[in-house]
From Swiss-Prot:
Keyword Protein biosynthesis: no
Organism: Manihot esculenta (Cassava)
Gene: UGT85K5
PANTHER family listed in its UniProt record: GLUCOSYL/GLUCURONOSYL TRANSFERASES (PTHR11926), GLYCOSYLTRANSFERASE (PTHR11926:SF1547)
EC number: 2.4.1.63
Binding site for an anthocyanidin: H22, A400
Location of the active site: H22, D124
Family: Belongs to the UDP-glycosyltransferase family.
Cystine crosslinks: none
GO MF terms held by the record: linamarin synthase activity
Protein's recorded name: Linamarin synthase 2
Reaction(s) catalysed (UniProt annotation): 2-hydroxy-2-methylpropanenitrile + UDP-alpha-D-glucose = linamarin + UDP + H(+)
Amino acid sequence: MGSLASEIPPHAVLVPYPAQGHVNPLMQLGKLLHSRGFYITFVNTEHNHRRLIRSRGQEFIDGLPDFKFEAIPDGLPYTDRDATQHVPSLSDSTRKHCLAPFIDLIAKLKASPDVPPITCIISDGVMAFAIDAARHFGIPEIQFWTTSACGFMAYLHHIELVRRGIVPFKDESFLHDGTLDQPVDFIPGMPNMKLRDMPSFIRVTDVNDIMFDFMGSEAHKSLKADAIILNTYDELEQEVLDAIAARYSKNIYTVGPFILLEKGIPEIKSKAFRSSLWKEDLSCIEWLDKREPDSVVYVNYGCVTTITNEQLNEFAWGLANSKHPFLWIVRPDVVMGESAVLPEEFYEAIKDRGLLVSWVPQDRVLQHPAVGVFLSHCGWNSTIECISGGKPMICWPFFAEQQTNCKYACDVWKTGVELSTNLKREELVSIIKEMMETEIGRERRRRAVEWRKKAEEATSVGGVSYNNFDRFIKEAILQHKTK
């Protein structure tokens, strides 16, 4: 992909939702646009701006001359805790309090002689206040939904669940009385779904629940944008993509997986844009280099999932008793309200076989030949990176559309198997052995490699996602620049 030759470069303002799983794909998009000659302004919240400085250093924030960082308040009380904030509070606050400071920022950028005129605003799909800001200034606005296409479609049907009387549930008994096994047969392009496969935010007894209302309303508001982009590829989610285009919007561009699309960017330049809010422990790569191909169980619950100390111990002894090498990511905040503490006898049992670190460069880990299976929460970043690496999955969804991604990984793409919510160590041992030692696991691995090859085809020169990215720049962005 060649860069754009122009005296005044196009200028994209990018606005991620303030969580690691949203900052990463927006940064990947910024990296891709920058490689095509765009000037980038990347807008974090003040809390995440501070975290990025701690993780990457002030020199990273100072950036390149044409890739700049700005920050706006999120409306929440100040905290210096190195963790993702409480998601419902954060979501409610961003939609209520971010519009005014964001408008002020856009006005400042427009008035500055040191930056090019703003060509477009590209905001996270759950930062839809940016649509109002863009309309205020007459700037094109593009929504980047960082979910899967099936997750996006599910959120668009929150209102239909209410209309049909399915949501809200009468009381909490629905969680264990079989109600969640009820078929959901009214979502176009998503056959064979059950309520348990829908995003977890539908599991409410009050439709005014913050996250149920937030995700449904943000999804519908995003349809007002000039275009929507998704970090997926057509062959992976063709049926639901066709349904979205037919029912809602034809201005949807599938431009992923980003992790493969960005391979055309020179490595030195690409490394300059890593956006982890935690410090990445690179010792894991050397550790993996010493392992046999397909021998390691990689475990990461993502940036938001929290577990109990009891669950931590079940995972620990399940991994230890499996007798397979493992790389386990244990964030400082992974245990609810406590520090993650494991007994000395666990460390003795896994000596020379297990590595525990707080955060890693996951894209590199999932591309490493030593990794044999990925135990994941099924967030979309992790899922699409896993597909891009050709790795099978052990799925343990936590919240949001992770349940939907798990359903597709296990039943549609056939690359995964699901763990029980109330996990016990014996089950984990059994599943790891199944995925690492049996024909079931080998078949899941073959399927994962097939999906990786299709992703590589989509993102190679002339592939569908590659061409869609070109079209996105020309149709959704640059045609407005000439007006």
